[in-house]
Amino acid sequence: MTDTGTLFLSQQDVINAGATDVDWVGAVLEQVFVLHEQQAFTAPPSSFLKRPECPHVADRIIGLSAHVGAPFDREGMKWIASSHINPEHGLPRANAVIILNDPVHRLPIAILEGALISAMRTAVVQALAARYLARADSESVGLVGAGRIGALTVWALSKWFPSIQHYRAFDQSADRLAAFVEHMATLGVTVEAVSSFQEALAEADMGIVATTESEPYVTASEFKRGSLFMNVSLMDPTFDLINAADKIVVDDWHQSVHSDRVLARMHREGLVTRDSIHGEFGAVVSGHIPGREDPDERIFWNPFGLAIEDIAVASAVYDQALAQGLGKSLQLVDQEWDVLF
């Protein structure tokens, strides 16, 4: 019988395998978007578990499954749970587990701590998008939402954009914002804390929203001419901000409009169609459509977040872990179990 061992990788194992290396993760994700453009993947709609007594947009469990083609050729699922009250209790907003299966026998080859992979791929995707969609001479970044995703995104941008001179951040929690500024300083990134989201975004060459707000509030006034607006959040930008964009770029059109996020709401009201957006990011990465063409154009980047990103990064981490002898082997399946039947 084929070996049925399953490799368990803790968060530290995932780190040791390279998951916090921005350049390495970025190279994996660039391949992913090329595969997306080539349709070399299978990814059904995400499965959402939401309870009526927990109406906040960030209170849910999502199951995202996918098969990613060569050179990864792996399939699996990310099971990610989120509660918007967690930070108030000193807990991470989101936690996740990723299960990888081999594509032939469908046996579980790995169980990975998935929150770090999920957060890193989210952050590095923004830096990758900035490479193609932001001005190369961008000097300022404005962030709303001083959480882990915001911190990792700023850190990733600092690695790839030495031209950035100013980072400004706002958060509704003054304590969280102060802790964020202090933490970023330990990473070598100086961030100025500001007193409003308008102050953070209005003059930013790259504007980032990474919050759990459930209603739109950021207007076109905070979308500077020549800037890139990264909608990492769920609902922050208003319709008028999105309408002000010269280009709208999404990671996956179908997923983007079959959700309860702001772009999907606009689509349901007939305000955004497939023909009215510039295109999908994979087409930009593959060179099939241009990214930024004009230093003055405003580009709205709307990443839904794709299962193929998680599975590809997890697959690369798994391969590195095997090569380095990391993790713990588990025997989930008893080869003799069928004697009972």
Locate predicted features:
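Adenosine-phosphate binding glycine-rich loop
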Residues: 13-18, 242-340
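N-terminal ligand-binding/catalytic initiation module
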Residues: 1-119, 127, 137, 279, ...
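NAD(P)-binding Rossmann-fold cofactor-contacting core
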Residues: 160-184
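Short helix-loop-beta connector
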Residues: 133-140, 163, 224-225
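Aromatic pocket-lining residues of Rossmann-like dinucleotide-binding sites
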Residues: 157
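N-terminal Rossmann-fold NAD(P) dinucleotide-binding loop
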Residues: 150-151
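Glycine-rich Rossmann-fold phosphate-binding loop(s) that bind the pyrophosphate
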Residues: 146-147
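Rossmann-like adenosine-cofactor binding region
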Residues: 187-271
